[in-house]
């Protein structure tokens, strides 16, 4: 399993059969917003917890061109594929819209 360059990952302390979690931030945030509490919390409870930086956010920096929700959906689907097994997607604010669109493409 490779780690996408725009993801923060906290591995489960003990291996379980639980699906990995992929957190998607809202506008004006990045993967970092999940890392102080949420990722360690779920990793301690047996989940591999991932958070993706959508393009133009977080460690990725400012986007040079216009970025659409469809671009963000592509980022989430790419991260979900790189995880290696289907994750549970969790989004906050704008991230929830991205998650809804991503889920509609996965079905």
Question: PLM features: residue spans?
Answer:
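A short loop-to-beta-strand scaffold at the N-terminal edge of the catalytic core in hydrolase folds
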Residues: 2-12
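Short Gly/charged-rich anion-binding patches and loops
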Residues: 37, 75, 98
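Glycine-rich, phosphate-binding/catalytic loops in enzymes
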Residues: 38-41, 66-67, 106-107
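Active-site loop/oxyanion-hole signature of alpha/beta-hydrolase fold enzymes
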Residues: 48, 56-88
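Conserved hydrolase catalytic core segment
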Residues: 86-107
């Amino acid at each position: 399993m490779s780690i996408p360059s725009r993801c923060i990952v906290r591995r489960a302390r003990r291996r379980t059969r639980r699906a990995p979690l992929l957190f998607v931030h809202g506008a004006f945030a990045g993967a970092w917003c999940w890392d102080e509490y949420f990722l360690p919390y779920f990793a301690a409870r047996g989940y591999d917890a991932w958070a993706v930086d959508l393009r133009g956010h977080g460690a990725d920096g400012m986007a040079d061109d216009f970025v659409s929700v469809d671009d963000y959906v592509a980022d989430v689907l790419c991260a979900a594929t790189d995880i290696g097994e289907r994750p549970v997607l969790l989004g906050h604010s704008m991230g929830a819209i991205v998650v809804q669109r991503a889920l509609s493409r996965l079905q």
